[in-house]
Curated annotation (Swiss-Prot):
<comment type="similarity">
    <text>Belongs to the universal stress protein A family.</text>
</comment>
<feature type="compositionally biased region" description="Basic and acidic residues">
    <location>
        <begin position="21"/>
        <end position="30"/>
    </location>
</feature>
<dbReference type="InterPro" id="IPR014729">
    <property type="entry name" value="Rossmann-like_a/b/a_fold"/>
</dbReference>
<feature type="modified residue" description="Phosphoserine">
    <location>
        <position position="98"/>
    </location>
</feature>
<feature type="modified residue" description="Phosphoserine">
    <location>
        <position position="102"/>
    </location>
</feature>
<dbReference type="InterPro" id="IPR006016">
    <property type="entry name" value="UspA"/>
</dbReference>
<keyword id="KW-0597">Phosphoprotein</keyword>
<protein>
    <recommendedName>
        <fullName>Universal stress protein A family protein C25B2.10</fullName>
    </recommendedName>
</protein>
<dbReference type="GO" id="GO:0000935">
    <property type="term" value="C:division septum"/>
</dbReference>
<dbReference type="GO" id="GO:0051286">
    <property type="term" value="C:cell tip"/>
</dbReference>
<dbReference type="GO" id="GO:0003824">
    <property type="term" value="F:catalytic activity"/>
</dbReference>
<feature type="region of interest" description="Disordered">
    <location>
        <begin position="1"/>
        <end position="63"/>
    </location>
</feature>
<feature type="modified residue" description="Phosphoserine">
    <location>
        <position position="44"/>
    </location>
</feature>
<dbReference type="GO" id="GO:0032153">
    <property type="term" value="C:cell division site"/>
</dbReference>
<dbReference type="Pfam" id="PF00582">
    <property type="entry name" value="Usp"/>
</dbReference>
<dbReference type="GO" id="GO:0005938">
    <property type="term" value="C:cell cortex"/>
</dbReference>
<feature type="modified residue" description="Phosphothreonine">
    <location>
        <position position="48"/>
    </location>
</feature>
């Protein structure tokens, strides 16, 4: 026995209380296809194809920029503006050239009294200083007398090698006796100046480049004894250094000989005096004392001092 399909069903499908749909016709399908078409609104902008947009990115338009600037064309075309940098041009005006090295000793002062016709004595002063020289409360001033003899050169050498230290000042006094032959040869001011510059150049060769000292050359025409006392009064040095011939005489007889400048300095100088003998004669005297058996105490002192 077979069951019959309920009312309101089609081919075994039940629609319940819903109204039964009507079958679609060819006219209804035509209306549905027309309604599904997308119509472009009148207010929308035209759509650019993707390929044409890429071609416009590859061919950007350029804007004139400054000559000395750095730009990136692809970044500008993409809407990014990089910061502007001025280009550095290396030329003579921008090149860093080190200045020539300055000399270790610089000229500071130079004057003379040759133009003063009323003066009885004439003098010429040359002064030079190391570029690192600086006067301090512990700075010392030394006066060294010299002449044309070799023993005076020994005194100058000993001063700069042994006694002179940084920030000290050395005054080298060169006295020319008016009655000497040298005074006759030096007839004009230029000849005196040339002699003073020659003395200064010889002294600078004796000084180490790293020794910060001040050097003064006093070239004076007059009596040596009077000029020494006058120079001591002007500069107030701490001590006076002079040379000696070192004759083979006992004790201070050679220093106190008649007419000796060292004798005058020892007797009349208001400041301490250092008398320097030539090196070879000092070594000879030292060896002689070492061989003397009666001076054992002196030899012991030398051994303890390491000399």
């Amino acid at each position: 026995m077979s069951e019959s399909a309920p009312a309101g069903s089609k081919e075994g499908v039940s629609f319940g209380n819903l109204p039964r749909p009507e079958p679609r016709t060819s006219k209804d399908q035509q209306k549905l296809s027309i309604s599904t078409d997308v119509k472009k609104p009148s207010h929308s902008a035209p759509v650019t194809p993707v390929r044409s947009a890429r071609s416009s990115m590859e061919q950007p338009t350029f804007r004139p920029v400054a000559k000395n600037s750095v730009t990136v064309a692809p970044a500008r075309a993409a809407g990014f503006c990089p910061p502007q940098f001025e280009e550095y041009h290396h030329g003579r005006s921008h090149s860093l050239v080190s200045p020539p090295p300055s000399p270790h000793f610089l000229k500071r002062i130079s004057f003379d009294t040759f133009n003063n016709k009323a003066a009885t004595d004439f003098s010429l002063t040359l002064k030079t200083q190391h570029q690192a020289y600086k006067w301090t409360r512990t700075s010392r001033t030394f006066l060294c007398g010299m002449d044309g003899n070799s023993y005076s050169e020994v005194a100058v050498d000993w001063l700069f090698e042994t006694l002179l230290a940084d920030n000290d000042e050395a005054v080298v006094l060169r006295v020319i006796d008016p009655s000497s032959k040298l005074a006759e040869d030096l007839s004009d001011e230029q000849s005196y100046r040339s002699l003073a510059e020659h003395i200064m150049a010889g002294i600078l060769k004796k000084v180490d480049d790293d020794k910060a000292v001040s050097i003064i050359v006093e070239l004076v025409v007059g009596k040596p004894q009077d000029m020494i006392l006058r120079t001591i009064h002007v500069y107030s040095p701490d001590s006076l250094i002079v040379g000696t011939r070192g004759k083979a005489l006992n004790s201070f007889q050679s220093l106190l000989s008649s007419g000796s400048v060292s004798k005058f300095c020892l007797q009349k100088s208001p400041i301490p005096v250092i008398v320097v003998r030539p090196d070879r004669k000092r070594v000879r005297s030292k060896n002689k004392r070492l061989k003397d058996k009666t001076r054992k105490s002196y030899m012991e002192i030398l051994e303890k001092s390491g000399r």
